[in-house]
Amino acid sequence: MAGSAVDSANHLTYFFGNITREEAEDYLVQGGMTDGLYLLRQSRNYLGGFALSVAHNRKAHHYTIERELNGTYAISGGRAHASPADLCHYHSQEPDGLICLLKKPFNRPPGVQPKTGPFEDLKENLIREYVKQTWNLQGQALEQAIISQKPQLEKLIATTAHEKMPWFHGNISRDESEQTVLIGSKTNGKFLIRARDNSGSYALCLLHEGKVLHYRIDRDKTGKLSIPEGKKFDTLWQLVEHYSYKPDGLLRVLTVPCQKIGAQMGHPGSPNAHPVTWSPGGIISRIKSYSFPKPGHKKPAPPQGSRPESTVSFNPYEPTGGPWGPDRGLQREALPMDTEVYESPYADPEEIRPKEVYLDRSLLTLEDNELGSGNFGTVKKGYYQMKKVVKTVAVKILKNEANDPALKDELLAEANVMQQLDNPYIVRMIGICEAESWMLVMEMAELGPLNKYLQQNRHIKDKNIIELVHQVSMGMKYLEESNFVHRDLAARNVLLVTQHYAKISDFGLSKALRADENYYKAQTHGKWPVKWYAPECINYYKFSSKSDVWSFGVLMWEAFSYGQKPYRGMKGSEVTAMLEKGERMGCPAGCPREMYDLMNLCWTYDVENRPGFTAVELRLRNYYYDVVN
């Protein structure tokens, strides 16, 4: 999305941010307009795109750089590049469609920072409000949702933010739009946008010399929006921004957003009851002073005597009150927050957690088919009747015939760990049942283990895998902060709720550390998954969050290998010898270099120099934001 792509260019001295074409030309004039002088700016048409402005024969030439679906950048019909900087470097050696070679970058003057676009100023608040309203999340659940799904939320907000803008009137008729525009002031350039039909087209209604003009806004096959024969835009707010600077095919520029009738009539409680205007020439220069209004608070009225044509008292990018559109869920793919396992079932204050987490067996129904089995027994799908809802659950059932007290102790130890954990990226325990067998009742993750899912779905793209391993790193960061060591982190113990939602499971080997401890020391060597273990675990029986980081590196290797077994064909002792020699597993085929570099960082031999999950999660997050957008 725009924000992350722009962030990746901010370090370039010749990147000017969200400036207009005219501003770019002024800068090139300042630089002497010599052939090959160039600068880079943010695209005002395409989300995540850029524009290249080049001087040649005393004229400025402009090229749109679009971000492709695979995350590369290209001028239309040209070669794809990993970044805008790479594209500029290439065209300094090959014109390849440009009017001339790029010879000299025009750098920002001292003290000048890249100009911020209107969406960057508002998106954080819009995202937060959208997540709060849509999923009723608060606190850590809200923060986790924003971090893990930020690219998707940015895209969602960018393409639907118009629903919250005062100039968007939704599904009203042509006649209604004319009546609305003609109410109140008759300022030239007063406008509104309405939805025309279900095909995604709109209409711009513009007041000029007392008449209402109608311009159709069509959506092409690629989703771009434009008036007939006009420039194409990714979003309505970009279109409005553009035509507030220049008419460019309209009879005049957009000047005054036409408010909804309730606000125009000055109804009590309407957020913008005062008639207002803003001067022509665009929105970006004025949006810097924007502050997101607190719920229930009006923005202060302009001081008396101020000149309405030159002083802005109405921000066209200020969201109006009210909920987001009801059809939004139909326009996007499901996010983790849409599932019933994103929040704990006990997050609802009306759902009372049973004392000592023991559940009533009569409220639990089990299916006959097994989801899986192991030394402990079996796992079955079930349904648990809570106070308000019936919850789909996974039930780990202890073998009855063995009557082994050690197995029971292990199950209860796992339950003891799980009852203390509450995070969207960790399988939560609902409770335990003592009936025909001991049962551990947990959240259900329908798609099963990550390794098996990837083995069967090799079409899954890298960015989807990065999304999932990032979620695992978020869950592990939570464990680290909560002073728990997992000790069995592997792809087989990551369960998928959906193709885009992973949860860490299987806490049978997990240990809680005391506040004064940073590692757990086992007394004896058990049935350990040695191929996932750090050297200090094997050599000294020491386990910490840093040893979980080593295991996470192996999990990443499994994920990018589409579920292959690590160190295939090797015995545990051979793996240990290999690690002692400083050797590591090779890069999986097709795995991004940045991800393999992170694996090797996780496999740092010296535990003191190995990063913790705070650093690992942040590095993954930044890379994930970059490739997904």
UniProtKB/Swiss-Prot annotation:
Predominant cellular place of this UniProt entry's protein: membrane
Pfam families: PK_Tyr_Ser-Thr, SH2
This protein's domain notes: The SH2 domains mediate the interaction of SYK with the phosphorylated ITAM domains of transmembrane proteins. Some proteins like CLEC1B have a partial ITAM domain (also called hemITAM) containing a single YxxL motif. The interaction with SYK requires CLEC1B homodimerization.
InterPro entries reported for this sequence: Kinase-like_dom_sf, Kinase_SYK/ZAP-70_inter-SH2_sf, Non-receptor_tyrosine_kinases, Prot_kinase_dom, Protein_kinase_ATP_BS, Ser-Thr/Tyr_kinase_cat_dom, SH2, SH2_dom_sf
Top-level taxon of the source organism: Eukaryota
Species this chain originates from: Mus musculus
One Gene Ontology term, aspect cellular component: nucleus
Protein name: Tyrosine-protein kinase SYK
